[in-house]
Amino acid sequence: MASLSSQSKLLATPYSFPYHTKPSRVSLRRVSCKASNDNKDKPNDQEKTFSIDRRNMLIGLGGLYGASNVFPSNQSTLAAPIQPPVLPDSCHPPEDLAEGVNVLCCPPDVKDPIDFQMPSNPSRLRIRPAAHLADPTYIEKYKKALAAMKALPQNDPRSFYQQANIHCAYCNGAYDQVGFPDVNIQVHHSWLFLPFHRWYLYFYERILGSLIDDPTFAIPFWNWDAPKGMHMPHMFIDPNSPLYDAKRNPAHFPDTIVDLDFSSGEAPSHNPRQIGNNLSIMYKQVVRAKKARLFHGRPLQAGSFPDESGDGSLEGTPHGNIHLWSGDPRQSNFENMGNFYSAGRDPLFYAHHANVDRMWYIWKNSLGRKDYKKKDWLNAGFLLFDENAQPVRVYVRDALDERKLGYAYQEVDIPWINSKPKPRKANPWPNRLRSKATTTTKLINKFPLTLDSTVSFEVKRPKKSRSKSEKEDEEEVLVIEKIKHEPQFPLKFDVYINDEDEDPSAADQTEFAGSFVNVPHFHRHGDKKDKRQTTNLSIGISEVLDELDVDGDDSIVVTLVPRVGSGQITIGGAKIEFVRDEED
C-alpha cells in the first residue's frame, strides 16, 4: 500500500469520473393509468394486458413466491419483492440523462455473487462518531482510509470510483428489475430508500476498515439535527484532504447554518430562528411519521415503476434539502451532492447518509415505532460488494438491527424530540361555515392543476372527532396525488393546513405541514412520450388537526406554495387516508 503522504499528493487533483458515450437502447412503452377522476377505477385494455403479463412474469420468478403467496384476494395484480440485479445482464448505461451527461455506472463483472451471512455477535461494536465531535486522531485515520480507497484501480469494486457509481446505478435507472427488462430498479421514492442506503454504507465502512487493517473503524455521521452539528463538518473542507470535494456550494461552508427547509437558489440563511426552525422540521418529519408507510415510504414491488410509489417523510425533508444545500449551484446539474448520479462522488454524502440511517435507529428505538412486516419489503434485495471485492446479495430482512451488523452511533443529545411546532393562531378556520364567511382565499375545485402560483383547496375528511385510541390505531394522512414533474430539475413546494393569512406560516409553526422536494436525478420511463415522473406525497396530520383544534371539522383547507420550479409541477388531486401500523 502506498504511504499516506504519497496518497495525499495523488489526491491533490480532483478524483476523475470519466464520461462515456451512451449507446442507444430500446425500451418497451409503459402502460399508464388514467389520471382523471372519472376513470380512476376503470383500467383500460392496455392496463388489463399489463396486469396479465405482469402476473405471468411474476409466476416465472420462482416457486418461492408462488400463487398462494402473491395472489392476495383483494389485489388484482401479483406482488413480489424486488430482487438483486444479475450481472452483467441487468446493468446498462442510465437513460434519459441531461444533455451532456453520459456516464457508465455499471460495476465490473468479477466473481459469482454469494448470499450475505449475518456476522456472529460482535465482541466490540463499531461506533460511528458525530463528525463535529471527532478528534484529530480519528480524522487522520479516516483520511488515511479514504486515501487508500481512492488509490485503488478504478476497476476494483472497492475503489472510491466504483463505490460512488453504486449510487449512480441504483438511482438513475441503470439496473433492470429481474424478470422485467423494461422496468428499472430505483431505490428512492419508496420503502427501499432506508434499507438500501444502510447496506450501501455498511460495505463502504467495511472496505475502509479493511484498507487500514482496522475492523473497528466506523464512518462519521453529520449531526445536522443538533445545533452544534448544523454546519458542514470542518473535516470535509480542507482542499488538501481526501475528504474534500470541489463541487460544493462555497456559500455554505462553515459556519453557515444548514437550512433543513432549503429551497434551491436561496441565499444562505441568516434567520435568527434558523436553528429553531430546523428542530421543528425534524420533529415534523420524524416524530409525526408514526406509521411505517409515512416514515419509510410507499411499497414498491417487482414489476412496478417507481412512479407508482412515494417518498417517506425523511427522504424528502431533510434528506433532499441537504443534498441540494450541499451541491454546487455553479454546476449545470448541481453536482456533486445536488444530483443523485454524482452524489456518491462527494465524501460528505456518506456522513450525510449515516445521519439519515441514525434517524431510522431513533425512530424505532427512541420513539418506539414499528417497521413494515410485509414479506415484499423484508425479502427485497440488492447486490453490493464487500471488503474482499466479492459481490454479495443482501436483503432488507437482515438490515433491521444495526447492532447485529456490528455498529452503533455515538450517543448525543436529540433536542428536536420535544420541539413541537406551535400554531400561529388559536383555532384558525374553526368550521366550514365560518371559514367561508371570514376568509378571502379563493378555493379551487378542479384537478389536475399546474402549480404556477399559490393555490388553496378543500379536502373532505371521511372521519372526524376520533378518540385517542382511534388516532393511535390509525393515522390520518393527507395525500397529494399524482404529482407529475420532470425529475432532472430541483423542485420544491410547501404544504399548509388551514393557514388563513396571506403570508405562509414559518417552519416552526403547526400550519406548515410539510414539503415536496425533488433532488435532480434521471431514470427510465416506460412511457417514452412523457418524460415526467409521477409520485405522491403523504403527510401525517392527526396531531396537526388536534393542535389547530379542528378535529371536529368536516374538511380542511390545504394550501400549496411553489418554492422551486413554479409551473413545472402538475397536481392530480388530494385526499385523506387512514394508515395503520400493519398493511398486510
From Swiss-Prot:
Keywords (A to Z) from UniProt: Chloroplast, Copper, Disulfide bond, Metal-binding, Oxidoreductase, Plastid, Thioether bond, Thylakoid, Transit peptide
Record-linked SUPFAM superfamilies: Di-copper centre-containing domain
Subcellular location: Plastid, Chloroplast thylakoid lumen
Chain segment of the transit peptide: 1-32, 33-79
The protein's Enzyme Commission number: 1.14.99.47
Positions annotated to bind Cu cation B: 319, 323, 353
Disulfide bonds: 91-106, 105-168
The family this protein is said to belong to: Belongs to the tyrosinase family.
This protein's name: (+)-larreatricin hydroxylase, chloroplastic
Organism listed in the record: Larrea tridentata
